[in-house]
Amino acid sequence: MDQLMAMRAFTRVVESGSFTRAADSLNMPIATLSKLVKSLEAHLETRLLHRTTRRVVTTAEGMEYYEKVLRVLIDIEDIDTAFRASCCTPKGHLRIDVGGSTARDVLIPLLPDFFQRYPDLRISLGVADRPVDLISGNVDCVIRGGPLDDSSLIARHIGDARMIACATPGYLKTHGIPAYPQELRNGHKLISYLSPVTGRAFPFRFLEQGEPLEISVPHHLGVNESNAHLAAALAGLGIIQTFGYAARAHLKTGALVEILSDWRPKAYPFHVVYPQSRHLTHRLRVFIAWLAEVFPAAVKG
């Protein structure tokens, strides 16, 4: 038995909750992975996992073993990284998840610089506004805006985006330009961004004399994807509140006009996030370091 590989197979099953997903993430047949875990249990003379037709449950002994093995694997990864980083260019495959407008307007335009620096790295980019499960979703990290509330994740702040309210000149000519946020309640057509998770509309947020102000009214149109949300505004359907970087090009051409600029809310924080349990490989380290260098100016908008 290759004990190190068996340990890696076991930890991946625990993290993903599935033999199939674990095998896929390790690029090995499920039969091979299952044999490794069974050999590990036989070697330890301990049942680590309970298997049913629907799910895999970690035993108490299995969880204790997982926590100890994880530290060993992280130490091994750190040792390898320390020696490789000084003499080798990073190689391999990164799986990154990012929201739609952030991918289109910030990350993808920056990627030529990344690939010029690290030509031996490959990236699979998952683009969706709906958050992924970092443990079972088989991704190395995600780039997300907004507050973080999961203590099991490690987050690095990589910039702040300004939020703006805007509409087309045609819409504003027909409906008038609101002079202050409360006027949005007076007959204006609002295009709300809907949470991809809950379906609820996010309120329009502003600052009034330094204090947060939220405007929540029934929306004319609700959209749960950031690129479609912007497209609705460009179609003249109403007023949106969006990231400055998403509207930047359209503000320059005059296709959109910012309104209520004196009431802009606080900047929206962005983070790159990964699980505490995920081994921080050399390739992920260089990607995060690169993000920290180039992302803040691009996301600011």
Task: Report each predicted region and the residues it spans.
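Short helix-boundary/capping micro-motifs
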Residues: 12-27
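Central regulatory/effector-binding core of bacterial HTH transcription factors
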Residues: 91-154
